[in-house]
Amino acid sequence: MSKVYDWFEERLEIQAIADDITSKYVPPHVNIFHCLGGITLTCFLVQVATGFAMTFYYRPTVTEAFASVQYIMTEANFGWLIRSVHRWSASMMVLMMILHVFRVYLTGGFKKPRELTWVTGVVLAVLTASFGVTGYSLPWDQIGYWAVKIVTGVPEAIPVIGSPLVELLRGSASVGQSTLTRFYSLHTFVLPLLTAVFMLMHFPMIRKQGISGPL
């Protein structure tokens, strides 16, 4: 086993990378509130794992979506647990994200030279809220249906572009299969991909610039 490790070490310098990661200086003023971003990331990873598991059973059609969710909750092995963890983690992720944004703002973490870190963080906050909006509709029950109808109808008040924007969100003039398909695609592919991209921008900047000093 050591020979295998030595082979990789010789080519990739794994130990040097590990030392750089584990030897980063942590300021003495850091406390539990500085862990909120990491907790948000942990919730996101739980969401990815449990969401991926549910895609094996969920059917994104207006006729089968609700029945497939019922199947997950009542018949699939540990389906009730996986979906429950997904829901609890979603609520926790939103809460931790809000607290994290407040902590960064109140401690001045958005100031120079961390403006771009703040911007990417705000984008991640918007993406987190978008996860909630799109995921809420996927069971396609009465609550989900009317939530989608209300949310997608909001842009209609915008002059000129309101109606085309509503049709773009819904996929047609009314809420239906096209809407569910779009929300499912957003929730399971587009939003996770964008979140991963902005996280890959967000974390290296934190790593490079370090944690902001105390007030």
From Swiss-Prot:
It is a multi-pass membrane protein. Its cofactor is heme b; heme c. Its main location: plastid. GO terms for biological process: photosynthesis; respiratory electron transport chain. Gene3D superfamilies: Cytochrome Bc1 Complex, Chain C. Disulfide bonds: none annotated. It is found in: Plastid, Chloroplast thylakoid membrane. Heme 1 (or BH or b566) is high-potential and absorbs at about 566 nm, and heme 2 (or BL or b562) is low-potential and absorbs at about 562 nm. The 4 large subunits of the cytochrome b6-f complex are cytochrome b6, subunit IV (17 kDa polypeptide, PetD), cytochrome f and the Rieske protein, while the 4 small subunits are PetG, PetL, PetM and PetN. The complex functions as a dimer. This is Cytochrome b6.
